[in-house]
Amino acid sequence: MITGSLVAIVTPMHEDGSLDYPRLRSLIDFHVAEGTDGIVVVGTTGESPTVNVEEHCELIRTTVEHAAGRIPVIAGAGGNSTAEAIELASFAQEAGAVAQLSVVPYYNRPTQEGLYRHFRSIAEAVELPLILYNVPGRTVADLSNDTTLRLAEIPNIIGIKDATGSIDRACDLIERAPKDFALYTGDDMSAAAFILLGGHGTISVTANVAPRAMHEMCAAALAGEALRVREINGRLVGLHRDLFCEANPIPVKWAVARMGLIESGIRLPLTPLSSASQERVLLAMRRAGVNV
């Protein structure tokens, strides 16, 4: 099981929106050097809705190849079509990802039984370990804890990224889930509490900007060092908040560009960060000790 701080890595783009693979390779090196515990590529923060299938597959391939075993790579491979999700999962397995992150189908609003059958079908078709991704704020459909626990009985469904931010739901899963079922939060603001309560890690937006601090905070939380967690997280709270002052990944891509790690390219319908929001994010970065 991968524990700790897994970065939901941004997808570097040139100003014209074309993908910047050299910068992606540099970002991978940056995260290896900073102690990040894993990389999730082509997820929400990686702008998965606006990359085409060929680009999606190439981003997975490039990340796995350049990581070269130095850091685990989890491939974003979900979708609202079960058949297409299976195709992406199959490619991720062939490319050498250690697992796939599969989002709850969006827009078509399946029932709990539909969600169960969707994920079961992917797991039966592709052996690659599957991490469920529940983010009802984006998908509308909400994978219930009961359905999650049904899915946890399937051998290669190995965990969940719960981006609800609900500590009540997290505690219920921590209490009822199998001990080898990985529990990740997708909510940076509650990540410290989530891990201290028994979660295994976070799939983090903040880790794009403060990877060392997120790694250290998660390590302290996993060790039960609450005072150390409080100290580190106190510096990061502004980032947890202000990296969502506009729709993710608009603020975090601006922040990573401000650090000089990528260009500021982003694809429509997402637009560049407003001037007022830039001031907020820059202040949060400085308070977190980011060198900008």
From Swiss-Prot:
It comes from the Bacteria. Pathway: Amino-acid biosynthesis; L-lysine biosynthesis via DAP pathway; (S)-tetrahydrodipicolinate from L-aspartate: step 3/4. It catalyses: L-aspartate 4-semialdehyde + pyruvate = (2S,4S)-4-hydroxy-2,3,4,5-tetrahydrodipicolinate + H2O + H(+). InterPro entries: Aldolase_TIM, DapA, DapA-like, Schiff_base-form_aldolases_AS, Schiff_base-form_aldolases_CS. One of its GO terms (biological process) is diaminopimelate biosynthetic process. HAMAP family: DapA (MF_00418). This is 4-hydroxy-tetrahydrodipicolinate synthase. It comes from Aromatoleum aromaticum (strain DSM 19018 / LMG 30748 / EbN1). The gene is dapA.
